[in-house]
Amino acid sequence: MFKRRHFLRIAGAATAACVSRRALAIQTTRGTRMKPRQDLLDADSPKGLEVFQLTQGELSGAHLYMEAQIFTLDSKRFLLHRSATAHGGGRSDPKHQYFVCDLEDGGLLEPIIPEMGGVAPSVSPDGRFVYYFIDETKPGVGRFLLKRVNIDGGGRQTVLTVDGPLPGTDFRASRLYPISTISSDGKRLAISAFLGDGKTDDADFGLMVFDLERATVRLVLHGPTWCNMHSQYSRSTDGDAAHDILIQENHGCVIDASGAIKKLTGGEGADIHVIRDDGTNFRNMPWGRDGNEFCQGHQCWRGRTDWAITSTGTRSPRGAFLIEGKAAPHAGHVGLKTPGGLRNDLTRDLKEAKFSHFAGDALGKHFVSDAGPFDKGGRILAAEFGEPGRDALGGWRYLLNPRSTCKKESHIHPFLSPDGTMAFFNSDESGVLHAYMMRGF
């Protein structure tokens, strides 16, 4: 069953009309302003680099995953969360809370999602709205809500309530993925979810695409290997390319009946694809799957181009490299052997490559990445892009050692503001995981 409220007809700040049953469980609090942390710099850090701690106190704070679309395009405001790890927060945790960080106001943190069960926020491309989900599901039962709120916290509205099978299917979605993705025109939003009934091992996962103007949802892809999809809309403003979504397929994964991942990949590992948001034009990215090169599972589009970047691990030569590629027609799950697939090693000029998590800016000019040795706190490096498909990354420079333990819950996960002037990262250097930012590099 679906309940639609066309949000253009809903009165401004009617927040109580469609609030989750658990919505009042969170007691919202304002955060503090950012704190200078020049003590994190070392002798090799560039002159003029400034470091700030954005969250403070005994309660953990973290950035959303680096591919999440959580910034306003003017680079002035973005989302982060408290009582969270580098990979998300607990949906039944009353302390887990999302904030808007206002960088023009000294990093002031203002609560933006008051309901418990809030997950997967995305900021609209025009910076006006935050879309998010309230997940009240369990495998085979429950409901979820797609909501919208103004970036200033006003005008909260329910776009769509889903409390039955997805249209045209027998699947009920549950365990919504912690990251959603929104199209460059702000008209469509996608998220993956578990589709199992809670009784069957290795059940399907699927990709849902929401039409934000019509308040409808469509299942465009499903299967048992889509457990960790990392779906990312192209940032291109081209009418056709704007419908492309980058997705990850985890071959050899093992899933229990509840949808929990018991084994992430097997055999030759994951591969990366591109699909149109109507479920057509399924393509390959030319990475991994040859027995030597393996996709780490971190990838993103290169600015607004049709090139994308992934981090790989190879057996020979031993390393973790950054490879950009361009999609080619699907020819089986053959990865880098895909006929017509274009590749470019962005790290070929370096003596060693130990890269993992990375991101670029909105225009595809600037780049930031973490790098090993991760058992010594890790490193954060910045670089500049050249011509897509031809040049290696250049202008490499070391920024700092974030002094993180680099455990899964405290991964550094660096990313850039849309304008490329600020870099953001996580660290538990204080003994508690917190969110940080840098500028002046």
Language-model features, listed with the residues they occupy:
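Blade/loop signatures of beta-propeller domains
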Residues: 28-51
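N-terminal export signals
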Residues: 6-27
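Conserved blade-ending motifs and adjacent loop-strand segments that build the rim/top face
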Residues: 347-357, 392-413
